Every structure is written in structure tokens, then in C-alpha cells.
Amino acid sequence: MLMLLVFGVLLHEVPLSGQDEAHPEADRVPGEALYDYSSLRLPEEHIPFFLHSNRHVASVCREDSHCPYKKHLESLNSCWGYEKSCTPESRFGSPICSYVDLGWTDTLESAQDMFWKQADFGYARERLEEIRMFCRPESASDSSLLCSRYLQYCRATGLYLDLRNIKRNHDRFKEDFLQGGDIGGYCKLDRHALVSEGQRKSPLQSWFAELQGYTQLNFRPIEDAKCDIVVEKPTYFMKLDAGINMYHHFCDFLNLYLTQHINNSFSTDVYIVMWDTSSYGYGDLFSDTWKAFTDYDVIHLKTYDSKKVCFKEAVFSLLPRMRYGLFYNTPLISGCQNTGLFRAFSQHVLHRLNISQEGPKDGKLRVTILARSTEYRKILNQNELVNALKTVSTFEVRVVDYKYRELGFLDQLRITHNTDIFIGMHGAGLTHLLFLPDWAAVFELYNCEDERCYLDLARLRGIYYITWQKPSKVFPQDKGHHPTLGEHPKFTNYSFDVEEFMYLVLQAAEHVLQHPQWPLKKNHDEL
């Protein structure tokens, strides 16, 4: 039985305990549902994909007259793409490739497959295929440790963590924070295999520094009462990127979502522990987003200082700056776009944060201009551009400045998600494109010679992207003045030719009106 459990974990068939499981009770009240379906909190479109990977829930639903998802029982072939039983035609969407990048491959089919593996659910499949057991249990009460290659993702049971003798300083990711015996479990450890996974040892790329000292203990931490604190709930450990920058912080959230897929569990009845070896706090301008992943406040690791803490189940999440990871360090084949992963992430977060689509509006295109109140990359003739937009009766124009002290993040998301054309200068605020509707267009007014960043993010999300094309019609205030690098295009402000600006916006509008998911086709001729 134990070996079946081990193999089930490796084959992605066993979710975190208590997660998404159906428990029909013999003594339940007559007339009650057999399962708490409301606890799923998934977008309707995701339900058949969830049921595919959770056949026990599907079986209960089939027998339960109260199940609201019976219509999805006919679509159980639908799958995300990483499941072993998943066929390409049943996947949650497929990338679209318009040409072959001969530097990578030589056919459209192979380009599509490569893009899917680089940045879609194929990435999850490759991580799942890498998973191996590093510390093997020999009985049901033993600990365990399994990880993907380079210890980029790990999952542990019966984890022992001794924080009685740690020393904190200013370093958020101190590599010698734990000493021998400070972390481990009661299981048979393959130490040679574990220490051979250190090729990508780096704070935000691997858990190697934290787990290289994992010790085979001679006691069962929980059963032998060796813990000051026993954490019963499944716990996700995360090393976080900059919480004040949306681009970097959403690398955290995207990788947490991908980790949930690898775990086959989307429950919010979990703890999230921020692995931070400093004594500092963490500034988080996007903290509302955690509500999509947990019912509880994020816990700083220092909360457990001076204690021996044991975790029944722990997950070491995929990290935000992994080499060839998502999405900070992602090398992408050109010519392809539209990943199911990023679209699913967008839908998942919006659904759980209760952000709804209130349009589109009949006879209107909702245009949002993201202004900047920072020192650099301001639009110097912004009023002139806005007035030009207002001459088009079809455009409903809104200028916003996403300053967190004046506009909460959830309100920012509501504006973004109810935008058809999103316009802004190069900067982290353009990460909002992740939450535009599928038919929308994003116009990076000027990319400041950083050509790939938001172009690639738009490709991943499947959103139409344009940027300024004619250097002779954009006018920098000066050559830019970075404090250490000298002249730099990101460190100045810009004016733009109004006629060229309008030409590009109308090009974006044309795309929106022709998009197959745009529901108001009659507006095309009016524009």
C-alpha cells in the first residue's frame, strides 16, 4: 500500500491530503450534497479539466443529484495538457505559430510543441517527469522528500525544521542559514543524489541551499513528539521576488499557480510561508492577490524562530527567477503566442478575486491610458493625445494612475479587466495586460529599447501587442540620465506625434473589433 502511495505521488495521482477530495459520509443529513462543490472556487470553464484529474470527485458528482457540474461529466477527456492520459486535441488550448523561427526549429508543428514546452502546460509536464524520490519512506508514518531536477520544486511529508539556533541578518536568502540536522525527516535518504542537484543553486532559482543539508533523522518528528509546533495544514514555502514591482511579484504568483497544478490541488485551506532569512518585513503592494491562493495571512518564516516546527505536508514552490523558468527568465521561440497556462492563470485569479467583465459596451471601445507619476517615462503631451482620442466617438477614454495609496489593487484589476485597449509606457504597470479580456489589445507606447519584455508577456497571455514603430516621431526630453549607467532611454520622458499615435490606436481598435471573441461585431463599420 505504501509503495502505491509513493508511485501515486510520482504519477501525479495523489493530491495534498484533504485537498479536493470527496468524502461521502454515511451519517450525512438526507438531502445534502455528497461533496462541498462550492469549495472548488474554479471558473466554470476549468471544471471539466479539474474533474479529469480528480475522477473521485467526478464519480461522486455522477451519483449526486445535487451536483451542479453534471453537464461537465460528458467532457472528462478535457485536460490541461500535463496529464499522462492527455491527448493534444483535448488540451486546454494550444499555442498559435504564424511562422517558423529557423534558429530554433524547421516546422510549424515543432515550433508549436516547443513553445508549449517552454511556456505552457508542457512546462508542468516536464517538471512532473523529472520528479524523483530523494528520501524514501519505509512505512506509512515515515517522512518523505521528492523533488524535480535542480530542486526547483519539492514536496515533503513529516518535515522537521529546527529554528532554535539560527542567526538572522540583512540577507533575505542566506545560504548557510540552516546547519546539519536543522532540516530533515525519518526516511531513507539518497544523499549522493540530493547533493548532485546543485548546478542551479541560486536564491530565486532553486531550493538547493535550503535542502542540501536535509538529514536522515533517527526519530519520527511528529509521532515521537519532537516538535514544539505541528503544522497540520498543507504548507507552501515560497521565496519571493520584489513585492513592490508587479512584473516581478507576479512571477511569484504565476509559479505558485503552476505549483498547484503539479500538486493537483487548488485548495485555499493551506498556509503560505515566506522563506526569508532576514529580520525584515516584506513590502507587498499586491497582497490582495494572496486571497486567490490562501484563506490565511502569509506567514514570515521568522514566526517560527526558536522553535522546532514539524509540517505534515510541505511544498517548496517553483521559483520566480528560475533559469528557463516562467516568466522572468523565459527564452521564447519567435512567431508563437497564446498559452493556455497564462490564460488559465488570469481566469483563476480574476474568478477568485471576484473581478467580473461588465462589457463590452454597445457602440463603444473602452480605452485606458496608464499615466505615470514617477520621475521618468512620463508622457509629456498626454493631454494632447487624450484629446485626440476623444475625437473618435466610439472611444470611451479613461486616464488612470495606478498609485496604490489612491487606488487599491482590486480596483485596478476591475479597470484593467474592463478595458478593450490598454495604453502605457514601458514599465511594470503593463503587467496588467495579464488580466485584459481575451479580445483586448495592449499598446506599449514606447518600449525604451527593451523590446522583448512586454511583447513576450503579451505573447504568453495571447493578447494583441503593438508598440511605437517610427523613431522619428517620438521625442525624448533628453538622452536620459541613469545614476550609474549614464545615458539611458528608460530614464527620461517623451512626447509623441499625435497623428502617428492615432494611427496605431486605430490599428489596435481594428484588431479588437475583428477578434473572434468580440461579441459586438456590428460596431466594426461604425468605427
From Swiss-Prot:
Glycans are attached at N354. InterPro entries: Glyco_transf_61_cat, Glycosyltransferase_61. A motif (Required for optimal activity) lies at residues 295-297. The keyword Iron-sulfur does not apply. The keyword Glycosyltransferase applies. Keywords: Endoplasmic reticulum, Glycoprotein, Glycosyltransferase, Signal, Transferase. It is found in: Endoplasmic reticulum lumen. Belongs to the glycosyltransferase 61 family. Catalyzes the transfer of a single N-acetylglucosamine from UDP-GlcNAc to a serine or threonine residue in extracellular proteins resulting in their modification with a beta-linked N-acetylglucosamine (O-GlcNAc). Specifically glycosylates the Thr residue located between the fifth and sixth conserved cysteines of folded EGF-like domains. This is EGF domain-specific O-linked N-acetylglucosamine transferase. It comes from Rattus norvegicus (Rat). The gene is Eogt.
